[in-house]
Design a protein with these regions (language model features):
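Generic recognition of stable, solvent-exposed alpha-helical segments in well-folded globular domains
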Residues: 48-52, 64, 85, 89, ...
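Conserved catalytic-loop aspartate of Hanks-type protein kinases
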Residues: 1
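Divalent metal-dependent catalytic cores for phosphoryl transfer on phosphate-bearing substrates
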Residues: 185-344, 350, 359-363, 372
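Long, compositionally biased intrinsically disordered regions
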Residues: 133-142, 151-166, 170-197, 201-216, ...
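Generic detector of multi-pass transmembrane helix bundles and their immediately adjacent loops
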Residues: 6-196
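A short, terminal or domain-edge coil/loop segment
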Residues: 98-99, 275, 338-343, 401-406
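Hydrophobic transmembrane alpha-helix bundles
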Residues: 102-108, 120-128, 146-150, 195-199, ...
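Generic, well-ordered alpha-helical scaffold segments in large soluble proteins
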Residues: 52, 56, 71-75, 92-97, ...
Length: 407
């Protein structure tokens, strides 16, 4: 069933397919051994294991489809009584209910035992009505409960090992990273509150755009949350964190200002690696400025020195190479530029978005991305609608009409 899901369903990210195939080998081998061994006792552990792993690897709707397919495969492959099949249905429904709003791996430690217990209760009740001997019912019910416990422990343990071994972003791991109370985001909020709120806005823009074009919205949102964590190194050098403090850049050279600003990308990669963030998220951090030039300080330095090369003012990249990374890259530029607008209306926002995106296309920053021209248009339209809503922008004629009504 896991292998079938790899072919028919799209996991959280292409890299995750490798991890899922590893899990398929484990679960498939267990089912094969249990099928040969026969009996109820060993069969339920791999069933619950694969069911739980579905919620680790897939979004919830896909995990539900995966679970239904798994029940059918188990019913066909493993000769178990109707009482057990009925119990499995209830157990699977229990997993769906428990995992429906789960955002942490610890939920699996609850879902597995509860599923095993509910399956055992249904099996016991139906077997009792069918006249099965009590010792047999008790033994098999115990096996079912144990199967849920073992599956939960194995799912959590194996997922942790695989995530660390292959450094991939499972759906459950990404959901954990969305918790704004975790240590890294809490530190960002405390030390760089302006950057923190900017990151939330970027995440909202990137995730919404990802949903519109069928990209991985969950990865885009997480990437938006963490893309600027490198600013923790020198938060006071970035305007959104300055507040009422003096502008430190007025007292230093444009070259030094640029050096500190450029460093935040590599600092973010270092911090993310130290906190064991998935490789896909680290890629977004590394690529969120591409190879663009820190234009303000380049222009400032050029005014002081003629024929100045822009290379010393250029981010090292690489350029964004996935749709999710590109969306964060574009959302970052658009959100930052929007905050600097003095006149906030639809025409100004539309011109700003067109300008930011066109400049990046012309500069070749999207050359390695996977976005089509049609998708870029969809993204721009979404950015515009989202920013209009966020800034409560009204058309000029509506504002004038309201003013007349209130006068």
């Amino acid at each position: 069933a896991s292998a079938l899901a790899v072919m028919l369903l799209e996991p959280a990210h292409a890299r995750t397919q490798h991890l899922l195939l590893e899990a398929s080998c484990i679960g498939g081998s267990c089912i094969a051994v249990c099928w040969l061994a026969g009996g109820i006792a060993p069969t339920m552990t791999p069933f619950f294991l694969c069911l739980l792993l579905g919620f680790v690897f897939f979004d919830r709707p896909l995990a539900t489809v995966f679970g239904l397919a798994l029940m059918v495969v188990t019913w066909v492959m493993v000769p178990v009584p109707a009482e057990v099949v009925s119990g499995l249905v209830i157990g699977a429904l229990t997993v769906f209910v428990v995992m429906r709003q789960a955002n942490k791996m610890s939920a699996i430690l609850v879902a597995g035992p509860v599923a095993g217990l509910s399956t055992a209760l249904v099996y016991g009740a139906l077997s009792g009505v069918a006249g099965e001997r009590l010792p047999v019912i008790a033994a098999n019910a115990g096996y079912l409960v144990a199967g849920g416990l073992i599956a939960a422990a194995f799912a959590v343990g194996s997922t942790f090992i695989f995530e660390r071994l292959f450094n991939v972003a499972t759906v459950m791991r990404l959901r954990e990273l969305l918790d704004t109370g975790n240590k890294l985001l809490a530190q960002l909020f405390e030390s760089a509150p302006g950057t923190y709120h900017h990151s939330l806005n970027v995440a909202n823009l990137a995730a919404g755009a990802a949903q519109r074009i069928g990209a991985n919205w969950l990865l885009a949102r997480v990437g938006g949350y963490y893309h600027d964590i490198g600013k923790l190194l020198h938060p006071q050098f970035f305007g959104e964190n300055r507040g009422e403090l003096p502008n430190i850049h007025e007292d230093i050279s444009p070259e030094l200002s640029t050096k500190v600003i450029l460093e935040h990308v590599q600092a973010g990669v270092t911090i993310a690696t130290g906190h064991h963030l998935p490789a896909e998220v680290i890629d977004i951090i590394a690529e969120h400025h591409g190879t663009t030039v820190v234009q303000f300080f380049y222009d400032k330095a050029s005014a002081e020195r003629a024929n100045l090369s822009p290379e010393a003012f250029r981010y090292q990249g690489p350029k964004p190479h996935t749709r999710e990374s590109t969306l964060v890259f574009l959302a970052d530029g658009v959100e930052a530029a929007a905050r600097s607008l003095t006149k906030m209306d639809k025409a100004a926002l539309e011109g700003l978005i067109d300008g930011v995106v066109s400049a990046r296309v012309t500069d070749g920053q999207l050359a390695e991305s996977q976005l089509t021209l049609g998708e870029i248009r969809v993204v721009k339209d979404y950015f515009l609608a989202s920013l209009i809503s966020f800034y409560h922008v009204r058309d000029a004629y509506l504002s004038a009409e309201e003013a007349n009504e209130r006068s």
